[in-house]
Amino acid sequence: MSILRKIKGKVRSLFRRKKTTEPAAAYDIWASSYDRQKDNPIAYLNSLVFNDILDALDLEGKTIVDVGCGTGSNWDKILSKRPYKIIGYDVSSEMLGRLHQKYPQATTFLLHDNALNGSWDLSCDMVVSSLVVGYIKDLPAALAEWNRVLKRGGEIVITDFHPVALQGGGNRSFTHEEKVVYIKNYVHPLHKIKALANKMNWQEIDLIERKVDESIKFFFEEQHVLHVYEKEFGSPILYGWRFRKG
């Protein structure tokens, strides 16, 4: 399949609803090609937002918990900040396998029922979670578990598909063997996340909301679907959030 067709399928798939696959099974399928994707506007924007947030943080000597670490796509950036340790969690054993190919000494755990097994209470300085929140069914339980392992004064960094995009018919998907795989996900409005954060005394430091704009226009131009770009221009597509535990 040509790059053009892949991009075309990816952007169109963002606005269709189909039969969905559970995240663990979907990412087991995606693992073999996940690090090679060049046609994903969400991954592109997420990298920009995640890196912008991390650029403002001092991670030297700190313990970082990465919830939904996947293949470790953010680990080069995190490791460049010289943390003491990264502990990775993911629901997909295949994604963790790919991570260990890149980082053989990595500490990782297969994630079940949101439990951060292997991390003690108040033991970490930061929890990061990139493109994961929308896959979590029981978000209050998950955030409570993050709060359990996080030290007072520790920080939380979340990036994810914007709920407004999902409510508007957007999908989380990828192409495998010329077929689009749609991943089961849940819509968690930002006000709901903020209410949960307030309940745990997480103080908002920064909120970035990225919209369909000129920075991703080329994805639409390359597949000749500028009408989709024009229709969605200005619509929220991804957010990045930084909190500090009080």
Model-inferred region functions:
Residues N185-L207:
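Short alpha-helix
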Residues S2-D58, S73-K77, M95-R98, V157-V180, K184, K211, ...:
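Conserved class I S-adenosyl-L-methionine
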Residues V65-V67, T71-L116:
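Class I SAM-dependent methyltransferase SAM/SAH-binding core
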Residues I205-G246:
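Conserved Class I S-adenosyl-L-methionine
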Residues M126-L139:
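A short SAM/SAH-binding and catalytic strip from SAM-dependent methyltransferases
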Residues G118-V127:
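A short acidic, Gly/Pro-enriched loop at the edge of an enzyme's catalytic core
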Residues P140-R152:
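A short glycine-rich, Lys/Arg-flanked "PGG" loop and its adjoining helix->strand segment in the class I
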